Swiss-Prot record:
SMART domains: BAH, PHD
Protein name: Chromatin remodeling protein SHL
Classification via SUPFAM superfamilies: FYVE/PHD zinc finger
GO cellular component: nucleus
Chief location of this protein within or outside the cell: nucleus
GO terms, molecular function: chromatin binding; DNA-binding transcription factor activity; histone H3K4me3 reader activity; methylated histone binding; transcription cis-regulatory region binding; zinc ion binding
Keywords attached to this entry: Chromatin regulator, Flowering, Metal-binding, Nucleus, Transcription, Transcription regulation, Zinc, Zinc-finger
Function recorded in the entry: Chromatin remodeling factor that binds to methylated histone (e.g. H3K4me2/3) to prevent their acetylation (e.g. H3K9K14Ac), likely by recruiting histone deacetylase (HDAC) complexes, and thus regulate the transcription of target genes. Required during development and for fertility, probably by modulating developmental gene expression. Promotes development speed, but at fitness cost. Involved in the chromatin-mediated repression of floral initiation and controls genes regulating flowering.
GO biological process: flower development; negative regulation of gene expression, epigenetic; post-embryonic development; regulation of photoperiodism, flowering; vegetative to reproductive phase transition of meristem
Biased composition (Basic and acidic residues): 204-218
Amino acid sequence: MPKQKAPRKQLKSYKLKHINKSIQEGDAVLMRSSEPGKPSYVARVEAIETDARGSHAKVRVRWYYRPEESIGGRRQFHGAKEVFLSDHFDFQSADTIEGKCKVHSFSSYTKLDSVGNDDFFCRFEYNSTTGAFDPDRVTVFCKCEMPYNPDDLMVQCEECSEWFHPSCIGTTIEEAKKPDNFYCEECSPQQQNLHNSNSTSNNRDAKVNGKRSLEVTKSKNKHTKRPG
């Protein structure tokens, strides 16, 4: 009669001796890439288990994908530290964990005073099979009608509260950083003098309340499935 395998123990936390840190369910971690020279994978710990003696720890992880691993690849509005929470789960040896990291919400990330090497942000969930995103649309800004990339400086119009990239309004980053009040072309005093107050008000309401958005999912031209 074949020997039955001993049941594995489910743990809420586990001490990783090789990095001298403890992990628990819900932690974001950096995991060793299977491809030399590639950056560490980012994952969320969903479960931890060991054998009956408390050895050979494994973690069930939910992978975060980088934009370049998705259908459509990296796009202009994707931040350098942006990741997508995928529907791809795996069991991995706990020994492949290289450290802990922090995956912030998009709102929290934009409020950070400084961004460390272990800081990331997530604003989309990603279906690794279909390439669909949730949400599938995102608000756009500026003349270029692009979603906000937290790596790129933007300036806000004092009148209509719209945001603009310096390059899109014909100025430099240095000029945009000056404390002077900024007015976009439509809200500038010169432009307002060409319209009566009623038409100016209508234009402003249309700009602020238009809720312009961009569809995130792109036509299929690239798809990288995380190995494992």
